[in-house]
């Protein structure tokens, strides 16, 4: 399955993605992330590693995916990416990605995305609340969401990654 998580800067996209990766890793699943996550079942990778045909099955987190697989990347992109995005299931991979808006993301990735999640965050002094609503990707932001939830911020999630970590654009993904 491929899921996109969208929201403005500071609205909890990476937090939500890291929370999901930690939950999967806690259950014993191998996970990979381009953002360093402090968990024994999460391996840090770079974007080029994602197209490696020998990457073992698992859950992959692509944070700020629009920096590498942006809407304008089509002609510059290495063909290995199109192969990967069309066949993640065959490789035993699920993909979670974050971006500030779905329009910034490569069309092929958007078209292959099962669900899009819109994140919001509210700070109430001592408590921070995160909320997410999901739609099938082709219905994103239209009508009643297919799923929704909210939860209080988790210190464990916050401590497992650096919210200031900047994704470096690796030119190796281009032709």
Tell what function each PLM region has:
Residues 8-10:
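The conserved Walker
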Residues 28-30, 56-59, 91-97:
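Loop/turn-to-beta-strand initiation segments
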Residues 13-14:
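Conserved lysine of the Walker
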Residues 32-56:
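Short glycine-rich substrate-engagement loop in P-loop NTPases that contacts/grips substrate
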């Amino acid at each position: 399955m491929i899921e996109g998580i969208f929201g403005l800067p500071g609205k909890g996209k990476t937090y939500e993605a890291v929370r999901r990766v930690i939950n999967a890793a806690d259950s014993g699943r191998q996970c990979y992330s381009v953002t360093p996550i402090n968990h024994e079942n999460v391996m840090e990778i770079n974007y080029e590693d994602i197209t490696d045909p020998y990457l073992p099955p698992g859950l992959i987190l692509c944070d700020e995916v629009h920096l590498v697989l942006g809407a304008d990347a089509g002609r510059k992109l290495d063909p290995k990416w199109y192969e990967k995005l069309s066949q993640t299931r065959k490789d035993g991979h699920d993909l979670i990605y974050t971006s500030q808006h779905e329009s910034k993301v490569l069309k092929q990735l958007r078209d292959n995305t099962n669900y899009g999640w819109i994140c919001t965050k509210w700070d109430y002094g001592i408590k921070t609340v995160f909320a997410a609503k999901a739609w099938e990707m082709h219905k994103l932001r239209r009508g009643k969401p297919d799923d929704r939830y909210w939860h209080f911020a988790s210190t464990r999630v916050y401590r497992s990654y650096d919210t200031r970590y900047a994704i470096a654009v690796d030119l190796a993904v281009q032709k």
